[in-house]
Amino acid sequence: MKLLSSICLIALAAPLFAEGPKVSAIVERARATAGTEAALNNLVTLQISGWIEPAESKMPSATILIISRKPCSQRLVVTVDDLVETTILQGDSGCIIRSNLSDEEKRSQIRTMTDEELKRVAFSTRQFFSFYGADFKRGERIEYEGIEQRRGVRCHKLLYSYPDGISTTRYFAINDDLLVSTITDKGVESVEVGEQIVAGIKFPKRVEYYQGQTMLHTMVVRDIKVNKPLKRGIFTIPTGQKTK
C-alpha cells in the first residue's frame, strides 16, 4: 500500500516540474543557500518587524509588523503616522481593519477581504514558508524559462504558477545559486539585499521593490523571530466578520 501511494505521489508531482531534473536541482541548490532542509521545514511561526522607506522623500515612511504561522495565518500591521492598517488572515477567512490612533472615539473601520485580496494574502503567507519550493498541494507548477541576464548576473529563470492565475518569476544566479530577483504577475520586482541568520535560516537585511526601472520603496528588516510563542487570538477575525 505504501509503495502504491508513493507511486501515485510521484505521478502527480512529476508534471509540476517542467524539465524535472534540471528545475528540481536548481530549486534544491537555491534552498540550500537559505538553510538546511531541517531548518526550513521546521519553520512554523515567523515574526518580522521593520519599516518601509519610500523612494520619494515626500512620501511618509511606515513601520511594519508581520506575524505568520504555517500553513496559512498572517497578521500584517502597517502604521503611517497615526493611521494603522491591520490585515488578518486565518485560513480561508480574512479582514482589514483601519484605525486612527489620534481619534480614540472614532471606531475602527473593519471589512471582509475581497476574494482577490484573500487569494493574494494567502499566497504571500505561503511564500514565507516555501523557500522556493513548489506548492504541490495547490497545483503550483515550476517551469524552466532558460538563462537570462538579470541585474548584471547570469541567471536561471524559473516561472512559478498556480491554476488560479497567480504567478511569480524568480531568477537564481548560475554561479552561486542565490536568488537575484523575484517578479510578481503584477510586475513588481523585489530584490533582497544583505543577510542575517536566524535559527539557521538566512533572511535579508532589506528588500528593495521596483516597478520596471522605477524604485518604489525599501523594506528594512529590523528584527526577526523564528518559532517563538504567539499571543493567543493573534489571528482571530473580529466578531461580526463574514467567514467563508
Q: Model segments located where?
A:
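Short, solvent-exposed secondary-structure boundary motifs
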Residues: 52-59, 75-80, 125-140, 159-163, ...
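Flexible, processing/modification-adjacent segments and terminal tails
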Residues: 19-28, 32, 93-166, 230, ...
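N-terminal mature ectodomain segment of secretory-pathway/periplasmic proteins
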Residues: 19, 25-103, 143-144, 162
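Sec-dependent signal peptide recognition
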Residues: 1-9
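Gly/Pro-enriched, hydrophobic low-complexity segments
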Residues: 83, 147-238
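Short amphipathic beta-strand/extended segments with alternating polar/hydrophobic composition
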Residues: 62-65, 86-91, 105-116, 171-172, ...
